[in-house]
A protein has these predicted regions:
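Extreme N-terminal basic, low-complexity initiation segments
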Residues: 2-10
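Cationic, low-complexity basic patches in intrinsically disordered or flexible, solvent-exposed regions
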Residues: 9, 17, 260
Length: 260
């Protein structure tokens, strides 16, 4: 008999997906496991500093959003469970995803991301401001190195380590991913650690971090790194639209053609 537990929302959780054959645990689709994983993310309270910060921000609010309810909890991942493109961000913005409850929604970084994803065929619209606006992603999954909004937009090392098991589980379920776009140095390192390549590759053989840098890993997946579309980068010209579009143009080409 299969061992069944329940997630914090009451959803059934089976210990491991089975084969569907007699005597095995019932066959569970990866999409179901991703829903359970997202439920676990939402109910995580593992980092006291981040819990206190996201709740404080949700209570005090920003003046322009004072009449809006804030999500104020860990923000789950989103997208197409069969995605071949994986985007790894840093963490929810205090008045962006921490307010709206969806990654890259309601802030300037999201405005850059949705425009690019729509331009290259991964999103059905170029603008998304609310988690209930019907946005649909195709062949793309979005996650982050940390799922809680951190002070000064920077989770510390211990917080990243505590959040990483969620990313490890996610990578195990996203079986079709062929291209990973890491937005920023922290996302780059977090993905390399979660995927195991940080430890398996000698330091001199690890993919380098630089905007537009591209590396094919031993398992055939391609890692592309990009500057994060934060205002610090976009307002100063460190990251331009042309630079930004070049990353997603390249990712789209690899995904659609099988090129490496």
């Amino acid at each position: 008999m299969s061992s069944v537990s329940r997630s914090k929302s009451g959803l059934p959780r089976l210990s491991e997906p089975g084969t569907g054959e007699a005597g095995s645990t019932p066959l569970i689709r990866p999409s179901a496991h991703l829903l359970i994983l997202n439920d676990d993310v939402i109910h995580c309270a593992g980092c006291p500093r981040l819990v206190a910060w996201r709740r404080s921000v949700a209570e005090t609010k920003k003046r322009e959003f004072r009449n809006e309810p804030y999500w104020g909890r860990p923000v789950p991942s989103l997208g197409d469970p069969g995605a071949r493109l994986l985007i790894v961000g840093l963490a929810p913005a205090a008045h962006g995803a921490n307010r709206t409850g969806r990654m890259f929604t309601g802030d300037s970084s999201g405005a850059w991301l949705w425009e690019a994803l729509h331009r290259f065929g991964f999103a059905d619209r170029p603008i998304s401001l609310r988690r209930d606006d019907g946005l649909t992603l195709t062949d793309c999954w979005i996650t982050a190195a940390a799922h809680c909004a951190p002070p000064d937009n920077r989770p510390d090392r211990a917080e990243l380590d505590r959040c990483r098991p969620f990313l490890v589980r996610e990578l195990e379920l996203l079986r079709q991913v062929r291209v990973v776009v890491a937005l920023g140095r922290i996302a780059w390192e977090s993905w390399l650690r979660a995927s195991g390549w940080w430890d398996r590759l000698p330091a001199r053989e690890r993919p380098a971090f630089a905007h537009g840098a591209e590396a094919v890993l031993p398992d055939g997946r391609t890692l592309i790194t990009s500057f994060h579309p934060s205002r610090q980068n976009t307002n100063t010209g460190r990251l331009t639209r042309e630079m930004w579009h070049s990353v997603f143009s390249r990712a789209s080409k690899i995904v659609s053609s099988g090129e490496q």
